[in-house]
Amino acid sequence: MFYRISLYAGILSLGAAALISSGRLAADNEPANNQPADEISGNYLETRTCDVYTGPCFANAQVGLTGRQAIMAWNIETGTHEGTDLSGLNVVLVIRAADTLGFGGTVVVRPDPIKSVILVDERATDAQRAALASFVKRHAARVTGDVVRVASLPIEMRFDLIDMECRLEAGKEARLVTRRLVARDRCCTNEEIFYPPLTEVEHSAPAFTIDGGFAGRGLGQTWSNPKTRSSFLATFAY
């Protein structure tokens, strides 16, 4: 009887300890000062120096030769990051890698080292600029690599997600104009989304790049990728 009572008491003690520990863990996971967790959403635009909508034969011919550069842009409609309101602001990440980015085929590619430039909206305050750079580093962590430059400049982004007609102008450094893919853009009958977007997004769809490229400093090269099936339009919510 004494053994059973002791055993039950031990179980109750362990249960109480678990509840206390659980409560502590829950408290530790709560935002500081009972602030609500960050939520942020908006529109996303991406372009690469290779076709993302293509057939396997074309993709395998390009891998290792193209697709080492990319432009990723977020148009933040509403939300906060690390407690800083970023509603209405834009931020752009420009990437140069050592090999094809995001290749999902059987050929082994090693994109590292990666260098990048972050372009932040000139309308942002100092605190917002820091938060925009942090936002990019968190949500594009796999491809941000070594950030060699952060610059503030006027960034304009326009989205028509129905007709897939979008425009990005980041000063005189980054530019992208897209339209919907149509039948004449197909080169074979095996086209598919061969390369997924480089970051987590929602409702992504490939688009035709009318004009696009990077003409800024920091990456040791500039590039353009007009008239290619190389862009993505999407939304995001984190």
Residue ranges and their predicted role:
Residues E77-D85, T100-G102, R123-L132, E165, ...:
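Short, surface-exposed beta-strand/loop "edge" segments at domain boundaries and coil↔beta transitions
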Residues L19-P31:
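Signal peptide processing junction and immediate N-terminal pro/mature segment
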Residues N34-G105, V109-V117:
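N-terminal Sec/ER secretory leader and immediately downstream segment
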Residues A98-D163:
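Extracellular-facing segments of soluble proteins and assemblies that are Gly/Ser/Thr-biased and enriched
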Residues M1-L12:
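Bacterial N-terminal signal peptides that target proteins for export
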Residues L176, L181-Y238:
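Extended, charged low-complexity segments
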Residues Y44, D51, D160, L181-V182:
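Processing junctions and N-termini across compartments
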Residues T49-D51, P56-F58, E165-R167, R186-T189:
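Sequence contexts marking disulfide-bonded cysteines in secreted/extracellular proteins
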